A protein has these predicted regions:
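Outer membrane beta-barrel
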Residues: 30-51, 55-173, 210-216, 299
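Detector for outer-membrane/organellar transmembrane beta-barrel domains
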Residues: 207-213, 217-327, 388
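Residues that define the transmembrane beta-barrel architecture of outer-membrane proteins
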Residues: 37, 57-66, 94-98, 143-147, ...
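Predominantly the C-terminal beta-signal and adjacent terminal strand-loop region
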Residues: 346-390
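Residues on the lipid-exposed face of transmembrane beta-strands in outer-membrane beta-barrel proteins
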Residues: 68-72, 100-104, 149-153, 207-211, ...
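Transmembrane beta-strands of outer-membrane beta-barrel proteins
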Residues: 39-45, 79-81, 112, 161-163, ...
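Solvent-exposed loop segments that connect transmembrane elements
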Residues: 171-196, 236-238, 269-291, 360-376
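Transmembrane beta-strands of outer-membrane beta-barrel pores
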Residues: 47-53, 65-67, 74-78, 83-89, ...
Length: 390
């Protein structure tokens, strides 16, 4: 009942923001340089038009999603809240909390942060330039938000260190289809089929180190880094405890408006499940799916931003390759590749993406896509989006 009430309030707030574009240009009070700080409201409203190769479409422009950010900034204390809602059948029938955290600036170079926040694994929250995301998002390693405590330090050598401990995931929220997969982040979820094992990830120790490459000639910039993930996986069905160990190495290079990023790593999970020892049940965005417990992952991204193109502020074409190469013999690899372009004009964004997926549950694949696979076809999605940012 409380989640439904929160969902209703968010819907009203979003409609209010959409109806007042003049006010939405500056929804803030206070000054971030003073002890009282600044409180700022921001977000977006998004509509979409999609064409899918694997199913018939109604080809209608529909409301897709909305995001609300509430940020508090002061010299010492800061906080961040992000809430999103999506439309499946009706306005905001799936909604979820993404972030809710507070932090303390020890000084200009060191801080601590507590609450529901992004996990410091891989090059950043997002590993690519596009708006749809890579296939590793569904494996539960990219754009992950869990509950815990993080330390971040920046040093004169150009080194950034992040050390974090997460007690567990951010929980489930409100959706029309699934009891436990109504969440933004891909986590282990409670099965709706009683024959499947219920897993829960806890005690996550995660670290990331980034190093600026200062020897590059101007105007090149770049960094390299590595991250590691160690956690317990509680098998709630038989009471045993397994673990996850994952690592990633990454690098990013830019030359003026050209950017390139590469991430690779390995995911290895022991679920202590005699029934399905090679796969585990995970879920997000109101869907459940099985994921192979062991595999290598790869993401490559390239983009170029053209500034001041006619009346547009910028136009950015981009491309992505992402794959999950499973270690188990006979398992088909999962891949998602993308070509896209984004155009920006004042507080509006226009996005066009052509996405190709193979053994990708979100792009026409079966529910076993991220586990055994079994689909020899490549499916395509044309994804057109319009954003109003406030």
């Amino acid at each position: 009942m409380q989640k439904k009430a929160l969902n209703y309030c968010v819907s009203l707030l979003l409609l209010g923001c959409a109806a007042t574009p003049a006010i939405a240009a500056d929804l803030s009070i206070g000054d971030p340089k003073t002890d009282l700080g600044e409180l700022k409201l921001s977000g977006f409203l998004r509509v979409k038009y999609q064409d899918k190769s694997w199913t018939e479409n109604d080809h209608k422009l529909t409301f897709d999603a909305a995001r609300i950010n509430l940020d508090y900034t002061s010299p010492k204390i800061f906080g961040h809240l992000e809430y999103r809602c999506y439309q499946y059948n009706k306005l905001c029938d799936f909604s979820t909390l993404v972030d809710a955290n507070v932090g303390y600036n020890i000084n200009d170079s060191h801080l601590i942060q507590a609450g529901l926040q992004p996990v410091p694994f891989g090059p950043g929250r997002f590993w690519e330039s596009n708006y749809y995301g890579g296939v590793i998002t569904q494996i539960g390693l990219e754009d992950v938000h869990n509950v815990g405590l993080k330390y971040q330090g920046k040093f004169d050598t150009g080194t950034q260190v992040e050390l974090a401990y997460f007690t567990g995931d951010g929980g489930s929220y409100s959706g029309p289809y699934s009891e436990d997969a109504s969440r933004y982040t891909t986590n282990f979820v409670k099965p709706e089929d009683s024959s499947l094992t219920h897993l829960d990830e806890q005690n996550m120790f995660i670290g990331r180190v980034k190093q600026e490459i200062r020897s590059l000639p101007e105007p090149m910039k770049g960094n390299i880094g590595a991250s590691y993930w160690q956690s317990d996986i509680e098998n709630k069905t038989n009471g045993q405890t397994g673990d996850r160990q994952a690592w990633a190495v990454f690098g990013n290079v830019s030359y003026n408006n050209l950017g390139f990023g590469l991430t690779l790593g390995k995911n290895e999970m022991d679920n202590k499940d005699p029934l399905t020892p090679k796969t585990s049940l995970m879920g997000s965005f109101d869907d459940n799916f099985m994921v192979a417990n062991e595999g290598m992952f790869y993401t490559a991204d390239v983009s170029y931003k053209f500034k001041n193109v006619g009346k547009l502020d910028a136009v950015m074409p981009y491309a992505m390759y992402s794959s999950y190469v499973k270690s188990e013999d006979g398992y088909d690899d999962s891949s998602r590749n993308l070509l896209g372009v984004a155009a920006y004009y004042k507080n509006m964004s226009f996005v066009a993406e052509y996405i190709m997926g193979k053994n990708d549950f979100l792009i026409g694949g079966p529910s076993s896509s991220y586990a055994q696979g079994g689909d020899d076809d490549t499916h395509e999605l044309l994804n057109l989006q319009f954003y109003y940012n406030f």
